[in-house]
């Protein structure tokens, strides 16, 4: 519901961006965590953001190897003081994760049985998302961006910083767990 936090721990797949957009439509605050983080780093961000739901992928695919996300998520939840009650897992065919009864749900099953909802009205200063700093100089800090400020900053920076005009193509190699990837992908 509006104002709830939803942590997204997924590889760079379309479902990650769709999850961000779904949260925005519902007025929920999405918290994207870089998929390469180990359980202790993820647990730190779970404790701080206190998400009502976690959306995760079963795995990520890197050159020459598969990275299983679900065991890292399970360990992070075990380590975290804040206990998440529901996890929606996007099962990738290359690595089907074991789901924990009562806590974990197959995201595709939920999508298949979903229905359309109207967008929830939000104020320009309502939080849109939280992204965490890397934590290299101390504890990671959750940076809150609001709906209006984020939209205005993106529009302005695309032209003023990158010189882009309508119809131009932009490519960013960053992960959506970092501000460049989150903002420009």
Question: Which stretches of residues belong to each language-model region?
Answer:
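Short beta-strand segments
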Residues: 8, 88-91, 146, 172
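Flexible loop/turn segments at secondary-structure boundaries
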Residues: 14-17, 95-97, 137-140, 152, ...
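Aromatic/hydrophobic pocket-lining residues that form π-stacking "cages" and hydrophobic walls in ligand
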Residues: 19, 73, 184-185
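Structural core segment of the AMP-binding/adenylate-forming
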Residues: 25-108
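AMP-binding/adenylate-forming
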Residues: 28-31, 46-58, 128-131, 142-185
